Curated annotation (Swiss-Prot):
UniProt binding sites for substrate: K7, D149
Single GO MF descriptor: caffeoyl-CoA O-methyltransferase activity
Naturally occurring in which organism (per UniProt): Arabidopsis thaliana (Mouse-ear cress)
Protein name: Probable caffeoyl-CoA O-methyltransferase At4g26220
Upper classification of the organism: Eukaryota, Viridiplantae, Streptophyta, Embryophyta, Tracheophyta
Pfam families assigned to the protein according to its UniProt record, in alphabetical order: Methyltransf_3
Pathway: Aromatic compound metabolism; phenylpropanoid biosynthesis
Length: 232
């Protein structure tokens, strides 16, 4: 089974494969397919955004008519490329990641797609980069969409900053909010290396559910995504 197929939370691998082959892959742009295949050979390929989750992201970007977006956590750039392809010609995505080396893997495909000019890559930890954006009052409520796939222990810290950067009616999407399904398992069934992030994810999910500033929807796509729409 392909690595991206392994990201699904559905109990039936055949059903997930059916979804990918019937509804996702036929609509996937060739440059995204190329980057997905390149990433497949990376030792940490499981970090990449699942293509079915990416497909939903593309629809959300279109629904909010996104022009200015933020991406926290880039890896090789599958979701970043998807965003850049979806944005209008004068759109802009601020992409934040500590590891430029992984971004460089996908950069040739991004250039080939002709969308590099839409990307402002910041090699930085996310919190100081977000704080820097907030230092400019013009940025408050100035973004349409954000996607977060980074340090899970800091998701809530990211949320408190992004809620100020995203406009009312804008969207924030968090990846990995079901953490391999472990959020519904007893700790005794969870591998030790998953425990710390599992606890942080459980706390995040509880806080997002209680956050009246956003409308939320949690979906079992990829490794679980939570969609937040800012209400005020």
């Amino acid at each position: 089974m392909a690595k991206d197929e392994a990201k699904g939370l559905l109990k039936s691998e055949e059903l997930y494969k059916y979804i990918l082959e019937t509804s996702v892959y036929p609509r996937e742009p060739e440059v995204l397919r190329e980057l997905r295949n390149i990433t497949h050979n990376h030792p940490q390929a499981g970090m990449a955004t699942a293509p079915d989750a990416g497909q939903l992201m593309g629809m959300l970007l279109n629904l909010v008519n996104a022009r200015k977006t933020i991406e926290v956590g880039v890896f090789t750039g599958y979701s970043l490329l998807l965003t850049a392809l979806t944005l209008p010609e004068d759109g802009k995505v601020i992409a934040i990641d500590m590891n430029r080396d992984s971004y460089e893997i996908g950069l040739p495909v991004i250039k080939k797609a002709g969308v590099e000019h839409k990307i402002d890559f910041k090699e930085s930890e996310a919190l100081p980069a977000l704080d820097e954006l907030l230092n400019n009052k013009v940025n408050e409520g100035g973004f349409d969409f954000a996607f977060v796939d980074a340090d899970k222990l800091n998701y809530w810290n990211y949320h408190e900053r992004l809620i100020r950067l995203i406009k009312v009616g804008g969207i924030i999407v968090y990846d990995n909010t079901l953490w391999g399904g472990s959020v519904a398992e007893p700790d005794s069934s969870t591998p030790e290396w998953r425990i710390e992030v599992k606890k942080a994810t459980l706390e995040l999910n509880k806080k997002l559910s209680a956050d009246q500033r956003v409308q939320i929807s949690q979906a079992a796509l990829g490794d679980g995504i939570t969609i937040c729409r800012r209400l005020y």
